[in-house]
Each structure stands twice: as structure tokens, then as C-alpha cells.
């Protein structure tokens, strides 16, 4: 399902990031910190009253060296292009400024709903001052203290009220995948090569109102796929096309919509921080992942090149130990024929369900190999385990005391489950719960 998008805009130091984190905090709970994963806070998922939405802090996209007015125009352009709902943040302490009026004139031209959030209204006496903001012509101003969380619920109510009507659930039998990577890694060439590889193209589908073009095709076994084209959202991508953080944001949105993510690396350039950031987001959101090293035909090789590359990838992406690696060339079509089958296998792993009886046999065998840990004379006791979700496969292990389940032992159990049931290319989640 395509989540509607909410963009936060406003001049610097009005509290955009604080509001962003406050809204994100209404939903996000981090189960574990994974070494090597870089969290990017310009894009996340929010939820209120059972409605989910993507949330963008446009201020995080700015080039801080750009002229002031250019920065805030950039924000407004992104919001008007990408968002379904715009939250315009101003400061109640400073009142209406020239910059606020400048942004409001831009936003006034859009047909998108604009929620005017007057931040830093930290005490009741300041509420009378918000009426000056009616002069911006953007409707009722909402008083807010994002630092203290006062008024956040009203902002969220307004967001949900203005979200577009929910679309029907997409066909679960269609596998959705995207090619993600830095500019110039060869994504467009890979897309064209994959689609030209004896595929039956069903139809180009307008995936969203923001001109993201999805392509449906069917393989020789009749499996349907939807390829989510990140290059752009091509039309919207004309806005600050070369801004790396903007590219990150669009990639994250594509990942959100995907079942399987093909993380494309340029063999000529190697692994960059951008790759880790995007891969970390795909891992955290539970997507299936394939690491695709493109332009393999362009580098000199010897008998050790593949193993050296694999070692380097495993070292840089330690949190993706489950992700298969494939070396391809869009130019020569080397190994491209393997990609659809890999995508299909990983989608099957994402949707795999394990009967509780079989799962518990594996857990008991694991305990026999490596007994449960003790702490201060008390031993962890595992009663049983059960699978509670797919995409990604998620298991709850019921124990006597959650505190006794050390992270390393949970990881050991995960590895035993992965080995027993061949969960290729997908993260799996294990959660320890105290039996009531």
C-alpha cells in the first residue's frame, strides 16, 4: 500500500525537527541498535488513529551553504511536489516574519492541504498571540509546543483529517521490488536490461499522483512483478535532482513500498556511506534485500576478486549477513537472468510460515547444543516459540524472565532458525516475552 506523505516545512529554528521527532516518537520503538546501521531522520513513518503516513522533514534536505531564501523555497518546492499534506511550522515567539510570508505565498498556490502550526507557544498567555498568523491566509493556526508535546495531538488530528482516502490493498500475489543506489550506479540500465530480458510487459501503471512510474511484468512461470521506479519519481525529481539527501528520501519512500530491495553498488566506485544508510533503512523496515554489484565487466579481475569483494561487502554491511550478493553487468547482461528467480525466492522467504511444532523442535535442539544462559544463579527457561507475522518473519519466544534473554543468545536462536528453514535474503525478528 502506498502511504500518503506529510511534509514539514518552515524556516530554520522554528522547531521542525522537534515536531518531526515528536510525531515519529508516537509510533517508533527501536527494538535493538544494529551496528553499522545509520539512521536518517529526514524520513520516517508516523501513525495516528490507525492511519499510517510517511513523514518528511524538508529542513533536513537543505544545503546549509545555500542562500537563506533559496533553502526555504527548496523546502516548499519539495513539499508541494511530494506531499499530500503540508505542515507549515512558524514560531509563536517571534511572530510573523518576512520569511514566513514568503513561504506562505508559495504554499498558497498549491491545492494541497496546509496545516499552520504555531510552535513555541509554551504557556497559555502566548495563545492570544497566534491570531496574528491569520494574516498568512492559510486558515486556522494551531498552537503548539513541540518541546513539551502540547498541541501535538491537535496537529495529528488535522493531518489525519486531511489525508487522502485510503486506497484498496494491493494484490498480495504481485511481488514489488525496487532498485536502490547512488546516482550513476547504473539503475536505469539495469531496469531496461531486466525488462528486456524476455519479459512480457503488462502495462505501465501510474503508481501515485506524484508521477512515480511502476512497471508490471510477468515472468515465464506466470509470476507477476511490479518494479518501482525510483529514478525517480521522474517528474518530481527535477526539483534539486542532484541533492543527495533528496535522493535518499525518494529511495526510502520506494523501499517503503517494496517487498524486495535490490541494493545496487557501482563496481567502479566501491561502497559509500550512502549505500550503508539506504541498506540500513531497508533492513530496519524488514524488507528482503539483494546486494547487486553492477558494472562488473568494467573492472580488472583475478582469481581473488570475487572473494575480496564479498569480504568487503560483508565487512561494511555486517547487519546484512543474510543478503545474497550477485555480480552483474547491465551492459553485457551478465547474470541478469538470475535476478527474477532471486527476487521470487526472497519473497517466498519473506512470506514463509513455520508450524509451531516444527519451530519448537528446532528451538529444543538449539538449547541442547548451547544451553540457555544464567544470571546470578538464575537460568533462562524457554517454554515455547511461535511465529506471529510475515514480511518479515517474526517469532515470539516465551520465557520465564525477559531480562535473562541476552542479545547474543537471541542471535544464536535466530541463526539456528535461519539455518533450519532457509530464510534467504530476509531479516527475521525474534522477540522474547515473559509467559503470563
From Swiss-Prot:
Residue span, EngA-type G domain: 4-167, 175-351
Domain KH-like: 352-436
Binding, GTP 1: 10-17, 57-61, 119-122
Binding site for GTP 2: 181-188, 229-233, 294-297
InterPro entries tied to this protein: G_ENGA, GTP-bd, GTPase_Der, KH_dom-like, KH_dom-like_a/b, P-loop_NTPase, Small_GTP-bd
UniProtKB keywords: GTP-binding, Nucleotide-binding, Repeat, Ribosome biogenesis
Superkingdom in the source lineage: Bacteria
GO biological process: ribosome biogenesis
Keyword Endoplasmic reticulum tagged: no
GO molecular function terms attached to this record: GTP binding; ribosome binding
Pfam families associated with the record: KH_dom-like, MMR_HSR1
Function: GTPase that plays an essential role in the late steps of ribosome biogenesis.
Record note on quaternary structure: Associates with the 50S ribosomal subunit.
Similarity comment: Belongs to the TRAFAC class TrmE-Era-EngA-EngB-Septin-like GTPase superfamily. EngA (Der) GTPase family.
PANTHER family hit by this protein: GTPASE DER
Protein name as it appears in the record: GTPase Der
Source organism phylogeny: Bacteria, Bacillati, Bacillota, Bacilli, Lactobacillales
Amino acid at each position: 500500500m502506498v502511504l500518503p506523505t506529510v511534509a514539514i516545512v518552515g524556516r530554520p529554528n522554528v522547531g521542525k525537527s522537534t515536531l518531526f521527532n515528536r510525531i515519529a516518537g508516537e509510533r517508533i520503538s527501536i527494538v535493538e541498535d544494529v551496528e553499522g546501521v545509520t539512521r536518517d531522520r529526514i524520513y520516517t513513518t508516523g501513525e495516528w488513529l490507525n492511519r499510517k503516513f510517511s513523514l518528511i522533514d524538508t529542513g533536513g534536505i537543505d544545503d546549509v551553504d545555500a542562500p537563506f531564501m533559496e533553502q526555504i523555497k527548496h523546502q516548499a518546492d519539495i513539499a508541494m511536489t511530494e506531499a499530500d499534506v503540508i505542515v507549515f511550522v512558524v514560531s509563536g515567539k517571534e511572530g510573523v516574519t518576512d520569511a514566513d510570508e514568503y513561504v506562505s505565498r508559495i504554499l498558497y498556490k498549491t491545492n494541497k492541504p496546509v496545516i499552520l502550526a504555531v510552535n513555541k507557544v509554551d504557556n497559555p498567555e502566548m495563545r492570544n498571540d497566534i491570531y496574528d498568523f491569520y494574516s498568512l491566509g492559510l486558515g486556522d493556526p494551531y498552537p503548539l509546543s513541540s518541546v513539551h508535546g502540547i498541541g501535538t495531538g491537535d496537529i495529528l488530528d488535522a493531518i489525519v483529517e486531511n489525508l487522502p482516502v485510503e486506497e484498496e490493498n494491493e494484490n498480495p500475489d504481485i511481488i514489488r521490488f525496487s532498485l536502490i543506489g547512488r546516482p550513476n550506479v547504473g539503475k536505469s540500465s539495469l531496469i531496461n536490461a531486466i525488462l528486456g530480458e524476455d519479459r512480457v510487459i503488462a502495462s505501465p501503471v501510474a503508481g501515485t499522483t506524484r508521477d512515480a512510474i511502476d512497471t508490471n511484468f510477468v515472468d515465464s512461470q506466470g509470476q507477476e512483478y511490479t518494479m518501482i521506479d525510483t529514478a525517480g519519481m521522474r517528474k518530481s525529481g527535477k526539483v534539486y535532482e542532484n541533492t543527495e539527501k533528496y535522493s535518499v528520501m525518494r529511495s526510502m519512500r520506494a523501499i517503503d513500498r517494496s517487498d524486495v530491495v535490490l541494493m545496487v553498488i557501482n563496481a567502479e566506485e566501491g561502497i559509500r556511506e550512502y549505500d550503508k544508510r539506504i541498506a540500513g533503512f531497508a533492513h530496519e523496515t524488514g524488507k528482503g534485500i539483494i546486494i547487486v554489484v553492477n558494472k562488473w565487466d568494467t573492472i580488472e579481475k583475478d582469481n581473488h576478486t570475487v572473494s575480496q569483494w564479498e569480504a568487503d561487502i560483508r565487512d561494511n554491511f555486517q547487519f546484512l549477513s543474510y543478503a545474497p550478493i550477485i555480480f552483474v553487468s547491465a551492459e553485457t547482461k551478465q547474470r541478469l537472468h538470475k535476478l527474477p528467480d532471486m527476487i521470487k525466492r526472497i519473497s517466498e522467504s519473506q512470506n514463509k510460515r513455520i508450524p509451531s511444532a516444527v519451530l519448537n523442535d528446532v528451538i529444543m535442539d538449539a538449547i541442547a547444543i548451547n544451553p540457555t544462559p544464567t544470571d546470578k544463579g538464575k537460568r533462562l527457561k524457554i517454554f515455547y516459540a511461535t511465529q506471529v507475522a510475515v514480511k518479515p518473519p517474526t517469532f515470539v519466544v516465551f520465557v520465564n524472565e525477559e531480562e535473562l534473554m541476552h542479545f547474543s543468545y537471541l542471535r544464536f536462536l535466530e541463526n539456528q532458525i535461519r539455518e533450519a528453514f532457509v530464510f534467504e535474503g530476509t531479516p527475521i525478528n525474534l522477540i522474547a516475552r515473559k509467559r503470563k
